[in-house]
C-alpha cells in the first residue's frame, strides 16, 4: 500500500496497515465531520485493492417516500456490484437481503488474498428507516464474511450521531463486531504546515495561523487555496467571491439532517 500522498494521519494509517496484514476478517467503522478526508484516506491507502465500493446517495425528502428512496439506493448498489464483476444477467435486488447475497456471490468469485469492501456514506445508503439495511449488513458479516477470515469491510459516514447509534454502539447484529473504530479529525496546525510545504505555498507562520483560524484544518477547504495568491486573497475568495463557505452552510445541514430547518435556525440565532 502507498501512503506517499497522505498528509499526517499516522495513527490511522497504522491501523489500516495492520488490518490489511492481519490474518482474520476485519470490520472497521470510520466517522468524522464532512470534508475531513475519510473517503480520501481509504482510497489512498487501498486504491485498486478495493474490490467493491458502494456510495450512499443523498435524496431530498427521502423520508417522505421511503420505498422510492430504498429502491434508488439499491439500484446504485447494484451498479456497484456490476462494476465489481456481477453478471448483468443477475436480477436487480429488491431488498437489502438480496443485495448482500449478490455481494457475497461477487466476492466468492474473487481470488484476492484480502477482499476489501468499502461502503461510503452509509447513513445515506441505509436511509431514514435504517434498521433493515443495518440488520442485513450485520447478517452478512456474522453469517459469512467474518468466518471467511480474508474480508475487510470498511463502513464510513459523516453523520456522527447516526454512526454512533446505528453502527458503533449498535445492540443488534453489529454489536461487539467492530474490530477497529476510527474517528477522523481535522488537520492539526502542524499538519497544515506540512500540507502547505508539500503544495508549494510560501507562507509565514502568521499566515498559516490566519488560515487555521479562518478555515481550520479541513482538507477540502485547504485544497481550494491557491499557492499563487496571498492568504488574504484566498480567504476573500473562499468566503466572498466564490461563496464556497456560504454554500457549505447549506450543503452540510442538508446532507446531515432530513429536516434541517430547526438546526439552521438554532445556528443562525447563536450567530
Region locations from a protein language model:
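Phosphate-binding site recognition
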Residues: 1-271
